[in-house]
Amino acid sequence: MFLVDSHCHLDGLDYESLHKDVDDVLAKAAARDVKFCLAVATTLPGYLHMRDLVGERDNVVFSCGVHPLNQNDPYDVEDLRRLAAEEGVVALGETGLDYYYTPETKVRQQESFIHHIQIGRELNKPVIVHTRDARADTLAILREEKVTDCGGVLHCFTEDRETAGKLLDLGFYISFSGIVTFRNAEQLRDAARYVPLDRLLVETDSPYLAPVPHRGKENQPAMVRDVAEYMAVLKGVAVEELAQVTTDNFARLFHIDASRLQSIR
């Protein structure tokens, strides 16, 4: 079986007491059939640090972007464009809108979101989107900026079936994290049942949001296995099928050559 953690923050893990190094994290993941990761940046300096931390590997690719919660730290759009064009970068982001924590930066968030989509279209690289308390504006910007030209994923999806449908209409993929396993997430489970298999991704969002039965612990790529097993039950398929489908979806969205994944198997 071959699973992909489609969204993790490898630079945020506890390398002092839980993991020896990135090799250790990836070995723990591989032991649970999680054999490929997308390491997601939230600032430009963070991307550079993570690139140095992880190094060049066959089983890790990167995104480059500025998270909506980091809009108080100015950045140069040309720097974003230059770094996002690097060969190891497969996506723009994590970008999007978060009005829950920082509504005061709403305008800057929207401008940054637009820049990420525009660069994604220029480079033919998809966008990784975060949204919280900003559903209408997120959908509006995705439409207005013609996100269908580059594609993307709504990561760590927490919205309802209706929102999922609107994202699917835009050609988006939808990624589910450990939140889907939480006891009070029935609306999310309803949305997960609705999303077709060929638009589905699974992720950890490590080091956050560890799935049941690991609540309260640091999340890590190995735990995407728990998300996949839970999602397989929701979708009524074997976990092996869900693993294959989500891996194929990941490769298609992020333009990962099948031969690269085959070499890791």
From Swiss-Prot:
Protein name (record): Uncharacterized metal-dependent hydrolase YcfH
EC numbers: 3.1.-.-
CDD domains registered for this protein in UniProt: TatD_DNAse
Swiss-Prot/TrEMBL keywords: Hydrolase, Metal-binding
Residues where a divalent metal cation 1 binds: 7, 9, 94, 205
Cofactors (names): Co(2+); Mn(2+); Ni(2+)
GO molecular function, one term: metal ion binding
Binding site for a divalent metal cation 2: 94, 130, 155
One term under GO cellular component: cytosol
